[in-house]
Amino acid sequence: MPPIGWRGTYAGIGVIIAAAVLPLALMMRRRPPAAVYEQAEAATEAARADVGISPRFLLILLVLAGFSCCTAMSMPQVHLVAYCGDLGYGVARGAQMLSLMMALGIVSRIGSGFVADAIGGAATLMIGSFMQGVALLLYLYFDGLESLFVVSAIFGLFQGGIVPTYAIICRELLPPRQAGAAIGLVVSATILGMAFGGYFSGLIFDLTSSYRMAFLNGVMWNAFNFAIVAWLFWRRQRRTPAGAFMTA
């Protein structure tokens, strides 16, 4: 990175992604046969009946959940380096913590996929949301160098798998012909949440000269996300036989 700077690095990443994703997208452009849509629609309609709410209301809830979870998630991701600088550890240590967090986020994304296959998207999202909230709380009580590395590792192990589970929930509960638009809306909400959360946390720091209230703000947004996901899980769990939802 030093020879080209962070701007050049980002530009290079963009070029690599465009060169890789566009050909891969063209390879998968063919639509599934109509019979596949009909089978999938029957399955999602039954699952939606278990939850007992309309597709539109469900989509609104998922958009709100996506926005709130990423508003919370953005606090450490955006401000961890500056936070370490304020604590006197230096921005280089903060960058190392952030790299550790992001690396474990990759592990989290893959691992969450295996977990979702076993217990379903909503249950996986609920676990990830809860543990992300726990990690945010830990940032409030531990500010030693070693402990911050540990907390950042915990945060990374659970935050990375949260966003992909929204696509799984959309696929499980929303009509297949609407899945593309639904996933696009929910993922867009997560991106807006990341932008808003990063800015708002910085604004809180500017007003209070402390990251403590910024972390508390993240905890509150995370609690809102957890409440939505737990409510969806509870509604389906109470309307299905024991264990049925966990293997959906």
Name each model feature, range by range.
Residues 1-33:
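Helix-loop-helix hairpin linking two adjacent transmembrane segments in secondary transporters
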Residues 29-48, 239-247:
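Flexible cytoplasmic inter-helical loops of multi-pass small-molecule transporters
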Residues 55-114, 197:
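Extracytoplasmic gate region of multi-pass secondary transporters
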Residues 108-120, 205-206:
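Helix-to-loop junctions at the C-terminal end of transmembrane segments
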Residues 131-143:
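C-terminal ends and interior cores of transmembrane alpha-helices
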Residues 161-174:
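Intracellular juxtamembrane helix-capping segments at the cytosolic ends
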Residues 173-210, 217-218:
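A late C-terminal transmembrane helix in Major Facilitator Superfamily
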